[in-house]
Amino acid sequence: MLTAPSLSRFKSPFISSPLKLPTLSSSFFTQKFHQTCRRRNSYPCIKAVDLDQNTVIAITVGVLSVAIGVGIPVFYETQIDNAAKRENTQPCFPCTGTGAQKCRFCMGTGSVTVELGGGETEVSRCINCDGAGGLTCTTCQGSGIQPRYLDRREFKDDD
């Protein structure tokens, strides 16, 4: 006569040690055990999938890539929102908070001296600043306050 394997020797790949069940011969225990088994069998069961190392690595890389791809834009958006809430009082670095920069062509004089040769010189009004000697700061647009990184204007090519 064939007998079923003892429940105390039941082994599972998901359990580190053999399942140890109390050895009660009462009908209460066997009835409870059969109810639990019946309940377990009534739900869909996920069985272990045999995955090789390359598949596991590929899945991990895919999940991490998606997480990073979503996480970076979310991080930038929160930084922009937080920066907009903070007051910006840092003076502009190029113009030291004045809002104007000295003209690079005439060095702030408003006129350009050109040596024609033979000892002759000609003084003319600066074509860059129109004789004003200074220009509006291109970094802060004349406000004197250093713009935040994402608020800086983009310079377009003159093509």
UniProtKB/Swiss-Prot annotation:
Membrane topology of this protein: Single-pass membrane protein
Any single GO BP term: photosystem II repair
Presequence boundaries: 1-47
Top-level division of the source organism's lineage: Eukaryota
UniProt region (CR-type-like), positions on chain: 85-145
Cross-referenced InterPro entries: DUF5351 (IPR035272), HSP_DnaJ_Cys-rich_dom_sf (IPR036410)
Transmembrane segments: 56-76
Molecular functions (GO terms): protein disulfide isomerase activity
Role description: Participates in determining harvest index (HI) by affecting source-sink carbon distribution. Up-regulates the conversion of fixed carbon to exportable sugars.
Note: Its sequence is related to the DnaJ family but lacks the J domain. The CR-type-like region is similar to CR-type zinc-fingers and was shown to bind zinc.
Record-given protein name: Protein SPA, chloroplastic
